[in-house]
């Protein structure tokens, strides 16, 4: 219920979210292997436009659980992990979805910086990319353009200081 969350935010509460298994379709942002990696990035843009200040990444390393794995019959492909084991080197390897998640976090922080410079422009820009978790642009060029515009806005604010 969006009104409930808006009321809580108006009362001064912070709003966090996370993705875990659902929704598992192509019309909602998530981080499944079957979705474009940019969806994982856009989650953070939708967090920004929704006033969400925290994101819990569920399942960093559940690659050994078949339900969340990469097998064709896995129900939630990739939801349980964004890294892969590198047992030979006792390390982990980042996935494309993990890198996209990192880029999304960086974008979120840049949006917050831009908000301090020009809140109207920052929110308008974010809305060109992800208005909600189910209303977003899947166009890579639009996302790239928004990122470049965001960087320019932050740079403009830096020069004015």
Per-range role (PLM):
Residues 52, 67-161:
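Catalytic domains of carbohydrate-active enzymes that cleave complex glycans
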Residues 1-66:
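Catalytic-core regions of glycoside hydrolase
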